[in-house]
Amino acid sequence: MNHQAPMTSIRARRFSKLTLVACCAALAACATQIKLATTDNPPPSKKFSAFNRFELKEIELASDYEAHAANQKATRKIQEHFHTRMQPVVDEWNTRSKARGSTLLIEPRIEQIKFIGIGARIWVGPLAGSSAVHMKVRYVDKHSGEVIAEPEFYQRAAALSGATTFGYQDNDMLYRIVSLVTRYTTNNYHQAVGGESGGTADARSNER
């Protein structure tokens, strides 16, 4: 009687289970912990049109994330989007008023970021985890130092969508977060209304 086939089948099943456990562990290890639970930003203390001049500062990247080349590359790309999306808005506002007066500083800062580059997406796929970025933007009265608003913004690219689009969704995330900032800025020019953050009420659903 041949007992070899059943034993081989048992080993195969055990190997499959171990492989599944290993994959789940790898996915858990790559889970992105960057999240934002708030869905809406409060209105600024005054509408932005109360100022005569506007200055858009360069993006600051939190020091904890400066060491990673992929994060630095993503920061440069976000900066490019600020130049093409936000800078024209600021320039247009500055042409409306020739009078000297108060100046509003716009200071974007990346608080947290995890960016999966195209190389990692090709070689590792969804096991690299999701991409995510969390930003704060300070709107400050240049003369008095008063903080007029400090909204937070969040975007992510899910691991599977990033992998199946070969990194397109990861890169599109960088464009989307600048779109959120631009929309908040323009919507609060004529009246202080606040705006969406891009976060989710149940941030636990964004762990991977």
Predicted regions and their residues:
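Bacterial N-terminal signal peptides that target proteins for export
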Residues: 3-19
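Hydrophobic h-region of N-terminal signal peptides that target proteins for export
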Residues: 24-30
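A structural "domain/chain start" motif
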Residues: 30-84, 116, 152, 183-208
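Surface-exposed short loop/turn segments
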Residues: 32-36, 93-147, 157-168
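Short secondary-structure boundary motifs at beta->alpha junctions and helix caps
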Residues: 67-72, 146-191
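Alpha-helix N-cap and loop-to-helix initiation/capping positions
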Residues: 74-78, 125, 169
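Extracytoplasmic/secreted envelope proteins and their assembly/folding machinery
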Residues: 79, 83, 87, 134, ...
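Ligand-binding grooves and catalytic loops that recognize ribose/phosphate and carbohydrate rings
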Residues: 90
